[in-house]
Amino acid sequence: MSRNENRAALSDVLQALQQEEVIAYPTEAVFGLGCDPDSEKAVNALLALKQRPWQKGLILIAANYEQLKPYVDDSALTDSQRETIFSVWPGPVTWVIPTHPETPRWLTGSFDSLAVRVSDHPLVQQLCSQYGKPLVSTSANLSGQEPCRTIEEVRIQFGSSLPVLAGLVGGRLNPSEIRDALTGKQFRQG
């Protein structure tokens, strides 16, 4: 840990991920809660902490598209659709892409698709690159509360035991835009 015990160094957060723990980290607009997408235990802990029903599905955030390919059905996309996606990545657009049948239900919820984003936040890029895979990502807030924008706000909502990657959120005021990769339909404005 660093001088301030409320802030974890990257190595501490990586260790927490390997131990199937939930972490908090800064993203483009707010702090996110994240965990290893391949750990059902970690995802269930995140859902319980967030007080979020599993049926809603989750978002994966990554350093690059290659990290997301094991979770989505890349063959469902046309070259034109891929071109559209890559034209705004890394960046603040989350795309909903069809999944493989073996993509875990704890990620997709009641859907046959998954929301994914390649982040342009330098700490998210570093975290996912060093971890070697994407992270589950959901805004750090309890149901009905405002999303956390500072480490202090994370501590108020979630307590002091949650590992929090030291850093600042990016300058964006709104969460990422969410679009359907096949139709272009907008689900959430960014």
UniProtKB/Swiss-Prot annotation:
Keywords: ATP-binding, Cytoplasm, Nucleotide-binding, Nucleotidyltransferase, Transferase, tRNA processing. Its EC number is 2.7.7.87. Its main location: cytoplasm. Residues 7-190 form the YrdC-like domain. The keyword ATP-binding applies. This is Threonylcarbamoyl-AMP synthase. It is found in: Cytoplasm. The keyword tRNA processing applies. Required for the formation of a threonylcarbamoyl group on adenosine at position 37 (t(6)A37) in tRNAs that read codons beginning with adenine. Catalyzes the conversion of L-threonine, HCO(3)(-)/CO(2) and ATP to give threonylcarbamoyl-AMP (TC-AMP) as the acyladenylate intermediate, with the release of diphosphate. Belongs to the SUA5 family. TsaC subfamily. InterPro entries: DHBP_synth_RibB-like_a/b_dom, Sua5-like_dom, TC-AMP_synthase, TC-AMP_synthase_SUA5. It is an enzyme of class 2 (transferase). One of its GO terms (molecular function) is double-stranded RNA binding. It catalyses: L-threonine + hydrogencarbonate + ATP = L-threonylcarbamoyladenylate + diphosphate + H2O. One of its GO terms (biological process) is regulation of translational fidelity. One of its GO terms (cellular component) is cytoplasm.
